[in-house]
């Protein structure tokens, strides 16, 4: 059904792009395995992915995925068993991921930069039987070995699946860049040997349904012990279809999309919005194994005709500040999506100046597969909001009593839609606490729905600072600090104060490397913020703690301050 409603409770429907339905088919029987099968049938000779300048077609991707399935079946795995992937964006990742899903197994994505403790928790909590790990991180597996319950590790190399050039890539990684620390692991198999082992068997098709589990996507690691969000095939397919409906209104049926996948595929945003979305379109994704290697990153995208890119605020800021990035040909760039953390107006302005395209902010969480909101793709300027709820998605703003507040009023953002997770893995109490009595997922984010239907985020509830009874949202203060011409990055936290309960404290990274004048910065803030929001102290740092995706870790700054 196309939107033509003047729905006062859902004002966003009146602002949908032409042709975008207010509902998708929520009863589709399609699975992620079907996405790959369709791509193999319809786009067999099209490039599916590119790594280190070498491309893999959809036909080749399907063939390798079936071999991965066969290998796991020969190891004795059954439908529903969990398989962990611990690697960055290398060619083997999509092949292994699709292979796991084709077999009816469940993908457990693990951040390759995790410590042995974090790896052990996620492996044992999920019950993963097999781990595919890039050899660069095998030493972490060795450290965790005594505590791990997994049966086997398959060792992947960065050059796997890219032919002759792969040998060169592997040699450079191991012997020139020395990226591989020594390790010794029992019960391991090189990925190339695993594929040879698989070829000795026969692929057995598995019946997969929309209510089967696809991913255990762990979340909450920046605020506490990570818990696994259960994402079913229907959750992910719904989100991919929601994204496709939004794109179709803007780009029609264009069939030559090239997505630059710079965010790691173990992160839900890149997984859905880059890898799976692009497979549905029959496009090609350019895999960036290390987006922090900016010279190599920019060199790669200079050689591509990118039409789409997904970034986080810190990555957009770093790229737009580089002279070599300013030399990239952006003439084919249709849009750039920003998500994963708050996008700052100063960064969006700089991005537009460099690329000629606005940053289009979206919003979501691991628990929502992840896209819940996105701005229209035809905007000319950054809106400052996170967009409109996508098709079949309802957002309700609730007060601390669980009551829905009026349009324009602030409260907790609660989401209902087919992309919302089934619950947390083996944590019924956490699951129950995370949903309202009428079935909305409680995000823990504070925001509002404006009169025009645009959703605006204030901050995380747990990050909100209470100064003399007044709410201060770190995002707002960080945005003001980031507008200063010499501030590259900013982070704001609350610290205990005997007079006001809490006080605002800021940390900044300067562009020129010099220490920022504390009073000068407070004057800057006073011009743009009411008094209780102005930081009591502003400290210059060489860098700020971040997750591998680039999200600033306020918790680490708070912990450091509390330790004294």
Model-derived regions, located:
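AMP-dependent adenylate-forming
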Residues: 10-17, 34-57
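ANL superfamily adenylate-forming
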Residues: 142-210
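Conserved AMP-binding/adenylation subdomain of ANL enzymes
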Residues: 237-258, 268-308, 322
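AMP-binding/adenylate-forming catalytic core of the ANL superfamily
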Residues: 114, 131-135, 309, 401, ...
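Gly/Ser/Thr-rich phosphate-binding loop
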Residues: 303-310, 320-381, 394
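Conserved adenylate-forming
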Residues: 72-77, 198-211, 216-261, 283
């Amino acid at each position: 059904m196309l939107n033509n409603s003047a729905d006062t409770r859902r004002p966003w429907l009146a602002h949908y792009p032409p042709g975008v339905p207010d509902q998708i088919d929520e009863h589709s029987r399609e699975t992620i395995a079907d996405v790959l099968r369709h791509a193999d049938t319809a786009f067999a000779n099209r490039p599916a992915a590119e790594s280190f300048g070498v491309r893999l077609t959809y036909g080749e991707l399907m063939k390798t995925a079936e071999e991965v399935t066969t290998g796991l079946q020969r190891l004795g795995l059954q439908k529903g068993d969990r398989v962990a992937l611990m690697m960055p964006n290398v060619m083997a990742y999509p092949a292994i991921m699709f292979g796991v899903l084709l077999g009816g197994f469940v993908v457990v994505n693990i951040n390759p930069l995790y410590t042995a403790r974090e790896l052990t928790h996620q492996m044992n909590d999920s019950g993963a039987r097999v781990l595919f790990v890039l050899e660069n991180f095998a030493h972490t597996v060795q450290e965790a070995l005594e505590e791990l319950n997994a049966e086997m590790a398959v060792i992947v190399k960065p050059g796997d699946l890219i032919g002759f050039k792969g040998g060169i890539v592997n040699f450079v990684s191991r012997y020139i860049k020395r990226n591989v620390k020594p390790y010794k692991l029992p019960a391991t198999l090189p990925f190339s040997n695993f594929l040879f082992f698989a070829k000795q068997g026969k692929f057995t098709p598995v019946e997969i349904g929309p209510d089967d589990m696809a991913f255990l996507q762990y979340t909450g690691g920046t605020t506490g012990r990570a818990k696994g969000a259960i994402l079913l095939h229907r959750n992910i397919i719904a989100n991919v279809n929601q994204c496709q409906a939004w794109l179709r209104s803007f780009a029609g049926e264009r069939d030559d999309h090239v997505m630059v996948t710079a965010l790691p595929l173990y992160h839900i945003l890149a997984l859905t919005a880059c890898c799976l979305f692009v497979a549905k379109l029959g496009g090609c994704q350019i895999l960036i194994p290390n987006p922090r290697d900016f010279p190599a990153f920019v060199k790669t995208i200079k050689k591509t005709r990118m039409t789409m890119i997904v970034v986080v605020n810190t990555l957009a800021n770093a790229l737009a500040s580089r002279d070599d990035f300013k030399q990239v040909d952006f003439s084919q760039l249709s849009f750039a999506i920003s998500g994963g953390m708050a996008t700052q107006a100063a960064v969006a302005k700089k991005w537009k100046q460099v690329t000629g395209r606005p940053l289009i902010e979206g919003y979501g969480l691991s628990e929502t597969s992840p896209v819940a909101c996105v701005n229209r793709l035809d905007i000319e300027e950054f809106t400052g909001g996170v967009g409109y709820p996508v098709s079949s998605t309802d957002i309700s703003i609730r007060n601390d009593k669980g009551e829905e507040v009026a349009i324009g009023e602030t409260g907790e953002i609660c989401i209902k839609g087919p992309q919302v997770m089934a619950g947390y893995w083996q944590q019924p109490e956490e699951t129950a606490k995370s949903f309202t009595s009428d079935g909305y997922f409680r995000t823990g984010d504070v925001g509002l729905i404006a009169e025009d239907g645009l959703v605006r985020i204030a901050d995380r509830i747990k990050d909100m600072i209470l100064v003399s009874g007044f709410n201060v949202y770190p995002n707002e203060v960080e945005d003001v600090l980031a507008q200063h011409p010499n501030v590259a990055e900013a982070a704001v936290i609350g610290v205990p104060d005997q007079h006001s309960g809490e006080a605002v404290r800021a940390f900044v990274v300067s562009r020129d490397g010099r220490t920022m004048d504390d009073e000068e910065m407070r004057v800057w803030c006073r011009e743009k913020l009411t008094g209780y929001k102005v930081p009591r102290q502003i400290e210059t740092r060489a860098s700020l703690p971040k997750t591998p995706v680039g999200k600033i870790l306020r918790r680490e700054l708070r912990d450091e301050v509390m330790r004294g």
